């Protein structure tokens, strides 16, 4: 691939005439031009391109630098030293060349550019051109090329004196100044760019961008940590679930061999059905049991007791018998049943069930001889806390299910009974309203106490009739019955009406009694 010339050289080539004479003259001058081109190629100046252009160091649209100026001056001086011959010299040389054989002059060595531009002193071997004198003619016959009428031009060289020390110093100073100026300009340009870059970096916009970038980086790191922690948690949960599944499978495999042809899904469906059936069965049993407790006779009031009495009976007796003198020797409960008339059905409450005497789980309470029928609606009823439903009567009224409502360990032994001073302190610390209400009542009618221990929303309660309650018959409802229904008030005739935890269903636990509520 050759180099392309400029448009000016192309136009010049078009308008240049190409005649035969010019071609002949060009053919004659070809060896000289070739020799000159070789010398110029060696020196590196004026190299011609393909289309006749010269390769100059000076650009077209740029002012030459100091180094280029120095090099151009050196080239100009070299051109002055190398002067072409005059026409007279050409004629003389042509005559001598025809008369005498061809003598080829030796071209003197011209000092190169580096020796001219360098501040070092030029050696005399390089500075002075060597002149070769013509050799004597050889005895050989002349060659046909020498006899030919070709004209050989002879060149003359002018002796160049050696530059003085001042000239060398001036050249060295110029070169050093040019080089130092170039280095200074380059360093100044770099420093100028650095200062501009620092000004941009230290500006407010760059600081704001940096702060935003740091915030985004912090947010990104936070999101990445959250995602990583969530993934780790998911992996831990999955591993835990897999571990539980393997344990479940191993526990199932440890059982007997399963010969069924059912799939795992069918087995799971059947298992869920069994569980649902068990839950429904328990609910239905609880519902039926609660209704059974509601419909039972009030006979269970004398059965569900600790040693024949409820848990709160000791506190009731203590409130009733505060006016009575304290006995150091506790009385024993009477095991003989009270006489029962045809139109009266009551229970005698003895003083033996105070906190000073321990309750015995083996004590019995004789039930009435005649069965008590279920009362009519809107009459008092006490539910029995037993599953038997009154089918069979036993000598001991304490049933197996009585442990749900009676707790014998809560009764205090005799040596832990409160003394007179302790009772006085308890009475002093009690509520003043209760002390004011404790007014003495007449002997024929005792004070009535009502303690809503149970839940009224179940419409159930327990009734304990006193000596003054009037019952016309076992099957007839009394006028002083306690009716615990929704949106109804508590009615009672006599000296005692207590709603106990016996009336609560099996699904609801007992609540502790709060005397200050």
UniProtKB/Swiss-Prot annotation:
Disruption phenotype: Formation of abnormally large and round secondary cell-wall pits in roots metaxylem vessels. The double mutant iqd13 iqd14 exhibits larger secondary cell-wall pits.
Region (Calmodulin-binding): 1-11
Residue ranges of domain IQ in the record: 168-196, 197-218
Listed Basic and acidic residues bias regions: 432-448
Biased composition (Polar residues): 89-99, 343-367
Entry keyword Hydrolase: no
Annotated disulfide bonds: none
Composition skew (Basic residues), residue ranges: 40-49
BP terms from Gene Ontology: plant-type secondary cell wall biogenesis; regulation of secondary cell wall biogenesis; response to calcium ion; xylem development
Cellular compartment(s): Cell membrane; Cytoplasm, Cytoskeleton
Ranges annotated as biased composition (Pro residues): 134-144
Recorded superkingdom: Eukaryota
CDD domains listed in its UniProt record: IQCD
GO CC terms of this entry: cortical microtubule; plasma membrane
Residue ranges of the region described as Disordered: 1-60, 81-147, 324-407, 425-452
Record's keyword terms, sorted: Calmodulin-binding, Cell membrane, Cytoplasm, Cytoskeleton, Membrane, Repeat
Skewed-composition ranges (Low complexity): 328-342
Organs and tissues of expression: Expressed in vessels of roots, cotyledons and leaves, as well as in trichomes.
GO molecular function: calmodulin binding
UniProt cross-references to InterPro entries, sorted A to Z: DUF4005, IQ_motif_EF-hand-BS
Protein family (similarity comment): Belongs to the IQD family.
Subunit details: Binds to multiple calmodulin (CaM) in the presence of Ca(2+) and CaM-like proteins.
Role summary: May be involved in cooperative interactions with calmodulins or calmodulin-like proteins. Recruits calmodulin proteins to microtubules, thus being a potential scaffold in cellular signaling and trafficking. Regulates the formation of oval xylem secondary cell-wall deposition pits through microtubule-dependent lateral inhibition of Rho GTPase domains, thus confining the area of active ROP domains within the lattice of the cortical microtubules. May associate with nucleic acids and regulate gene expression at the transcriptional or post-transcriptional level.
Protein name: Protein IQ-DOMAIN 13
Gene: IQD13
């Amino acid at each position: 691939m050759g180099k392309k010339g400029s448009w000016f050289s192309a136009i010049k080539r078009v308008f240049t005439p190409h005649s035969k004479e010019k071609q002949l003259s060009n053919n004659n001058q070809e060896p000289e031009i070739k020799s000159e081109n070789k010398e110029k190629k060696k020196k590196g100046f004026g190299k011609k391109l393909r289309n006749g252009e010269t390769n100059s160091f000076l650009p077209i649209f740029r002012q030459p630098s100091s180094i280029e100026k120095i090099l151009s001056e050196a080239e100009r001086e070299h051109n002055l030293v190398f002067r072409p011959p005059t026409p007279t010299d050409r004629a003389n040389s042509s005559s001598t060349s025809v008369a005498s054989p061809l003598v080829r002059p030796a071209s003197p060595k011209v000092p190169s550019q580096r020796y001219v531009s360098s501040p070092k002193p030029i050696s005399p071997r390089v500075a002075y051109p060597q002149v070769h004198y013509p050799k004597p003619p050889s005895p050989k016959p002349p060659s046909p090329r020498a006899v030919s009428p070709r004209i050989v031009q002879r060149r003359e060289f002018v002796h160049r004196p050696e530059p003085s020390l001042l000239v060398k110093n001036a050249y060295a100073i110029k070169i050093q100044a040019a080089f130092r100026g170039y280095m200074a300009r380059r360093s100044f340009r770099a420093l100028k760019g650095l200062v501009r870059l620092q000004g941009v970096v230290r500006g407010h916009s760059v600081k704001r961008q940096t702060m935003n970038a740091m915030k985004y980086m912090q947010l990104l790191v936070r999101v990445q940590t959250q995602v990583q922690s969530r993934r780790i948690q998911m992996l831990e949960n999955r591993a835990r679930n897999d571990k539980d599944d393997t344990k479940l499978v191993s526990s199932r495999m440890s059982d007997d061999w399963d010969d069924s042809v059912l799939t795992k899904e069918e087995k799971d469906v059947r298992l869920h059905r069994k569980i649902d059936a068990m839950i429904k069965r328990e609910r239905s049993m609880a519902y039926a049991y609660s209704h059974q407790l509601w419909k039972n006779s009030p006979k269970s009031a004398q059965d569900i007791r600790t040693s024949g009495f409820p848990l709160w009976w000791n506190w009731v007796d203590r409130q009733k018998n505060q006016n009575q003198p304290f006995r150091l020797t506790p009385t024993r409960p009477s095991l003989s049943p009270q006489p029962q008339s045809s139109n009266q059905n009551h229970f005698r409450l003895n003083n033996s069930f105070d906190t000073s005497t321990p309750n015995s789980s083996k004590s019995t309470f004789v039930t009435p001889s005649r069965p008590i029928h279920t009362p009519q609606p809107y009459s008092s009823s006490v539910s029995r806390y037993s599953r038997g439903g009154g089918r069979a009567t036993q000598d001991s009224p304490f049933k197996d299910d009585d442990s749900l409502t009676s707790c014998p360990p809560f009764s205090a032994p005799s040596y832990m009974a409160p003394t007179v001073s302790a009772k006085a302190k308890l009475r002093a610390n009690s509520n003043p309203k209760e002390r004011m209400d404790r007014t003495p009542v007449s002997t024929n009618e005792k004070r009535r106490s009502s303690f809503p221990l149970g839940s009224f929303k179940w419409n159930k309660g327990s009734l304990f009739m006193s000596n003054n309650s009037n019952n016309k018959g076992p099957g007839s409802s009394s006028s002083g019955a306690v009716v615990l229904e929704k949106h109804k008030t508590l009615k009672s005739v006599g000296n005692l009406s207590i709603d106990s935890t016996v009336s609560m269903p099996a699904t609801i636990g007992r609540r502790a009694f709060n005397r200050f509520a």
